[in-house]
Design a protein with these regions (language model features):
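Catalytic strand-loop-helix junctions within cyclic-nucleotide turnover domains
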Residues: 25, 64-73, 88-115
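Short amphipathic alpha-helices in soluble, non-transmembrane regions
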Residues: 39, 76-83
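Short, internal active-site loops enriched in acidic
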Residues: 14-20, 59-60, 102-106
Length: 115
């Protein structure tokens, strides 16, 4: 990462619009699972070559944003969400939750691998 920029982990979670914390219905799970490949396609189109993405669960993608600020990471997340809804109007009833955290490293972790 550049001197004034860091790496951020971005977690995007698809949720059914009616989701209130109780058990998710089979219909909602079906909609979420069908939407995930479309979100993956949006991610491919939206991320830089140095960014890494992986499916984290049936309803989540985790993205490592390199050389980024918090504000830049939020811009990326909102751009992805806007593009997803623009290209996939059928899934507008699904919500996408954003979680973003700065990647933290400590001397102990680094020293373990550097001798």
């Amino acid at each position: 990462a550049r001197f004034d920029e860091n790496e951020y982990i971005l977690l995007l979670t698809l949720k059914a619009g009616e989701y209130t914390g109780s058990r998710v219905s089979d219909v909602d799970l079906f909609r979420i699972r069908n939407a995930m490949p479309h979100l993956a396609e949006t991610l491919k189109k939206s991320l830089r070559p140095g960014d890494a993405v992986a499916q984290f669960s049936d309803s989540q993608y985790v993205i490592l944003l390199s050389a980024c600020t918090y504000e830049g990471g939020m811009l990326v997340a909102n751009r992805i969400i806007s593009k997803f809804y623009q290209d996939n109007k059928i899934y507008r009833n699904l919500k996408i939750k954003i979680n973003i955290e700065k990647v933290k490293t400590t001397e102990n972790i680094l020293s373990k691998y550097t001798g």
